[in-house]
Swiss-Prot record:
Molecular function via GO: magnesium ion binding; xylose isomerase activity
Chemical reaction(s) catalysed: alpha-D-xylose = alpha-D-xylulofuranose
Gene coding for it: xylA
Name under which the protein is recorded: Xylose isomerase
Highest taxon, organism lineage: Bacteria
Summary of subunit composition and partner proteins: Homotetramer.
Keyword Mitochondrion set for record: no
Enzyme Commission identifier(s): 5.3.1.5
Length: 435
């Protein structure tokens, strides 16, 4: 049943590259086979409940520009929001969605009321999933917006806040499991510090390790089969976050013995804030064995903060999905559009248009990445660059020879290597040919 919010807009269809219909896909064809698998199954698109239906469009200099009929802290408004959200999911045709608890329920007076509201909405989501075929990619708890979390959740100096946050996560994991969620995400927006003058760094890291260990322990206790994911971000809102980037998260997981239990959910915008490319973070996660999922968006490269725009750079998407394919593709993860409309994009159809453009951009990137992989366009030059390590001397360097033996061979054989071209321009031109 239509809520009327989207007017007479019909379900988005694939119309091909020649279409000029802004409410149709030009490149995303869910059933198209890429590397032996349906495009939908490669990309596993998800809609973010928070940016699409809970965000009011505000910024530090102005209040909310969006006027949505569900913008109130009442359970009936939350139910209307659910109706509109699932209508949107059906129109768009993305197979998954994601949410924070605070996105979907009113803010209650206490923990018990929050839990009651969440369970009431989960009852509704269960029915709507059964009716529409929608699936939950991941759930999470909002441990950063309420003023109780000003100094963090897991890293808060007040043990009562730690306990409240832990209890909240427990209810959110329960909700995620009930809804068949394939992952559970932790993003530490307030897990960090503003100044070291009032921060016990060692204690806070240990508390964060304890918190994550409790999450993993509870996952196994209740038989939740999904993946636990950490989402790295270097700053904003906190001056310095403890889950700064993929490398930092991996070091943290290793320190607390969780590297085999937890993977990463990598957001493009957060990679940029950390001074990395999206491709770098994906490649490193793949190399370290902790690649899990993607939050897809982009930042404005001039602004210096997290702008959460829909992706529109095909070469970036091609290199990103090339790393995803090298990792073997998604298992429980997917491509969640952690992207929001611009403040002046007021019309309901703008929400569809933003997602359509993002899905088309990702589809083009995936197809280019698949062709590069099939043709060996990047792997063959890479193999040639490192070919010396496959020879007898290269293998002995990596296992068997001591430092003094290496020195002896260098002198005896008069080894005097000369540099070889890295061929960067050639490789960049190859990528441009595919996109």
């Amino acid at each position: 049943m239509s809520t009327g919010f989207f007017g007479d807009i019909q379900k988005v269809r694939y119309e091909g590259p020649e279409s000029d219909n802004p409410l149709a896909f030009r490149h995303y064809n869910a059933d198209e086979i890429v590397l032996g698998k349906r495009m939908e199954d490669h990309l596993r698109f998800a809609v973010a409940y928070w940016h699409s239906f809970a965000w009011e469009g505000g910024d530090p200099f102005g209040g909310r520009p969006f006027d949505r009929p569900w913008f109130s802290n009442e359970i009936d408004a939350a139910k209307l929001k659910a109706d509109v959200a699932f209508e949107f999911f059906s129109l768009l045709g993305a197979p998954y969605y994601c949410f924070h608890d605070a996105d979907v329920r009113p803010e209650g007076r206490n923990f018990a009321e929050n839990t009651r509201y969440l369970n009431e909405i989960v009852d509704i989501f269960e029915k709507k999933q059964a009716e529409t075929g929608m699936k939950l990619l991941w759930g999470t708890a909002n441990l950063f917006s309420n003023r109780r979390y000003m100094a963090g959740a897991a890293t808060n100096p007040d043990p009562d806040v730690f306990a409240f946050a832990a209890a909240t996560v427990k209810t959110c994991i329960d909700a995620t499991k009930r809804l068949g969620g394939e992952n559970y995400v932790l993003w530490g927006g307030r897990e960090g510090y503003e100044t070291l003058l009032n921060t016990d760094l060692s204690r806070e890291l240990d508390h964060m390790g304890r918190f994550l260990s409790l999450v993993v322990e509870y996952k196994h206790k209740i038989g939740f089969k999904g993946t636990i994911l950490i989402e790295p971000k270097p700053q904003e809102p906190t001056k310095h976050q403890y889950d700064y980037d993929v490398a930092t998260v991996y070091g943290f997981l290793k320190r607390y013995g969780l590297e085999n239990e937890v993977k990463v959910n990598i957001e493009q915008g957060h990679a940029i804030l950390a001074g990395h490319s999206f491709e770098h973070e994906l490649a490193l996660a793949r190399t370290l064995g902790i690649f899990g999922s993607i939050d897809m968006n982009r930042n404005d490269y001039q602004s210096g903060w997290d702008t959460d725009q829909f992706p529109n750079n095909v070469p970036e998407m091609a290199l990103a999905y090339y790393q995803v394919l090298l990792a073997g593709g998604f298992t429980t993860g997917g491509t969640n559009f952690d992207a929001k409309l611009r403040r002046q994009s007021l019309d309901p159809q703008d929400l569809l248009i933003g997602h359509i453009g993002g899905m088309d951009c990702c589809a083009r990137g995936l197809k280019a990445a698949a062709r590069m992989l099939e043709d060996g366009a990047l792997s063959k030059p890479l193999d040639e660059r490192y070919a010396g390590w496959n020879g007898e001397f290269g293998k002995r360097l990596l296992s068997g020879l001591s430092l003094d033996q290496i020195a002896g061979e260098v002198e005896a054989k008069d080894i005097n290597p000369q540099p070889k071209s890295g061929r960067q321009e050639y490789l960049e031109n190859i990528v441009n040919r595919y996109v």
